[in-house]
Protein backbone atom coordinates (compact mmCIF):
# COMPACT_ATOMS: atom_id res chain seq x y z
CA UNK A 1 0.00 0.00 0.00
CA UNK A 2 2.87 2.36 0.79
CA UNK A 3 4.21 1.92 -2.76
CA UNK A 4 0.85 3.06 -4.12
CA UNK A 5 1.06 6.34 -2.21
CA UNK A 6 4.46 7.12 -3.70
CA UNK A 7 3.20 6.28 -7.19
CA UNK A 8 0.18 8.61 -7.07
CA UNK A 9 2.19 11.88 -7.06
CA UNK A 10 4.28 10.63 -9.99
CA UNK A 11 1.12 9.85 -11.97
CA UNK A 12 -0.34 13.25 -11.10
CA UNK A 13 2.81 15.01 -12.31
CA UNK A 14 2.86 13.01 -15.52
CA UNK A 15 -0.70 14.07 -16.35
CA UNK A 16 -0.15 17.81 -15.90
CA UNK A 17 -1.06 19.74 -19.02
CA UNK A 18 1.32 22.25 -20.59
CA UNK A 19 -0.98 25.04 -19.37
CA UNK A 20 -0.83 23.84 -15.77
CA UNK A 21 2.93 23.47 -16.01
CA UNK A 22 3.25 26.99 -17.42
CA UNK A 23 1.13 28.40 -14.61
CA UNK A 24 3.33 26.71 -12.03
CA UNK A 25 6.57 28.06 -13.52
CA UNK A 26 8.12 31.28 -12.36
CA UNK A 27 7.97 34.14 -14.83
CA UNK A 28 11.45 35.09 -16.03
CA UNK A 29 11.88 38.71 -17.18
CA UNK A 30 13.53 38.98 -20.63
CA UNK A 31 16.46 40.86 -19.10
CA UNK A 32 17.31 37.85 -16.89
CA UNK A 33 16.70 35.06 -19.43
CA UNK A 34 20.41 34.56 -20.20
CA UNK A 35 20.84 33.30 -16.62
CA UNK A 36 18.59 30.35 -17.49
CA UNK A 37 20.24 29.20 -20.74
CA UNK A 38 20.00 25.43 -21.09
CA UNK A 39 16.91 25.19 -18.89
CA UNK A 40 13.20 25.06 -19.59
CA UNK A 41 11.51 28.28 -18.56
CA UNK A 42 8.77 30.81 -19.11
CA UNK A 43 10.01 34.21 -20.25
CA UNK A 44 7.38 36.95 -19.93
CA UNK A 45 7.44 40.53 -21.13
CA UNK A 46 6.24 43.02 -23.70
CA UNK A 47 6.90 42.22 -27.36
CA UNK A 48 8.73 45.44 -28.26
CA UNK A 49 9.10 44.53 -31.94
CA UNK A 50 7.91 41.65 -34.11
CA UNK A 51 9.34 40.83 -37.52
CA UNK A 52 8.44 38.27 -40.17
CA UNK A 53 11.73 37.81 -42.04
CA UNK A 54 10.33 36.39 -45.28
CA UNK A 55 13.54 36.97 -47.22
CA UNK A 56 15.74 35.22 -44.62
CA UNK A 57 16.60 31.52 -44.69
CA UNK A 58 13.80 29.53 -43.06
CA UNK A 59 11.46 32.56 -43.17
CA UNK A 60 11.48 33.01 -39.38
CA UNK A 61 9.32 35.31 -37.30
CA UNK A 62 11.02 37.04 -34.38
CA UNK A 63 9.34 38.44 -31.29
CA UNK A 64 11.84 40.78 -29.62
CA UNK A 65 11.49 41.42 -25.88
CA UNK A 66 13.53 43.24 -23.27
CA UNK A 67 14.22 46.28 -25.44
CA UNK A 68 13.90 47.33 -29.06
CA UNK A 69 15.80 45.49 -31.78
CA UNK A 70 18.81 45.38 -32.00
CA UNK A 71 19.28 46.10 -28.30
CA UNK A 72 16.79 43.47 -27.12
CA UNK A 73 17.76 40.91 -24.48
CA UNK A 74 15.47 38.06 -25.56
CA UNK A 75 13.77 36.77 -28.69
CA UNK A 76 11.20 34.12 -29.49
CA UNK A 77 11.95 32.57 -32.88
CA UNK A 78 9.20 30.90 -34.92
CA UNK A 79 10.52 28.98 -37.91
CA UNK A 80 8.65 29.59 -41.15
CA UNK A 81 7.67 25.91 -41.29
CA UNK A 82 5.78 26.38 -38.00
CA UNK A 83 3.88 29.57 -38.95
CA UNK A 84 1.06 27.51 -40.45
CA UNK A 85 0.30 26.08 -37.00
CA UNK A 86 -0.83 29.53 -35.84
CA UNK A 87 -4.39 30.75 -36.47
CA UNK A 88 -3.04 34.33 -36.50
CA UNK A 89 0.06 36.10 -37.76
CA UNK A 90 2.53 35.95 -34.83
CA UNK A 91 3.82 39.46 -35.61
CA UNK A 92 0.42 40.80 -34.47
CA UNK A 93 1.68 40.18 -30.92
CA UNK A 94 3.80 43.35 -31.16
CA UNK A 95 2.98 45.64 -28.24
CA UNK A 96 1.36 42.85 -26.21
CA UNK A 97 2.53 41.17 -23.00
CA UNK A 98 3.40 37.56 -23.80
CA UNK A 99 4.90 34.54 -22.04
CA UNK A 100 7.10 32.24 -24.12
CA UNK A 101 7.51 28.70 -22.81
CA UNK A 102 10.34 26.37 -23.79
CA UNK A 103 14.04 25.60 -23.60
CA UNK A 104 16.06 28.79 -23.25
CA UNK A 105 19.02 28.88 -25.61
CA UNK A 106 21.77 31.37 -26.32
CA UNK A 107 21.77 33.42 -29.51
CA UNK A 108 24.89 35.61 -29.63
CA UNK A 109 24.78 37.57 -26.35
CA UNK A 110 21.02 37.14 -25.96
CA UNK A 111 18.60 34.43 -24.90
CA UNK A 112 16.15 32.81 -27.28
CA UNK A 113 13.37 30.23 -27.27
CA UNK A 114 12.54 28.37 -30.48
CA UNK A 115 8.73 28.28 -30.65
CA UNK A 116 7.37 25.28 -32.52
CA UNK A 117 3.68 25.46 -31.60
CA UNK A 118 1.08 28.03 -30.50
CA UNK A 119 0.87 26.36 -27.07
CA UNK A 120 4.33 27.80 -26.32
CA UNK A 121 2.97 31.38 -26.48
CA UNK A 122 0.52 32.81 -23.95
CA UNK A 123 -0.91 36.30 -23.62
CA UNK A 124 -0.01 37.61 -20.18
CA UNK A 125 -1.07 40.20 -17.67
CA UNK A 126 2.16 41.61 -16.27
CA UNK A 127 2.06 44.11 -13.42
Question: Residue ranges of each PLM-predicted region?
Answer:
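OB-fold single-stranded nucleic acid-binding module
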Residues: 23-127
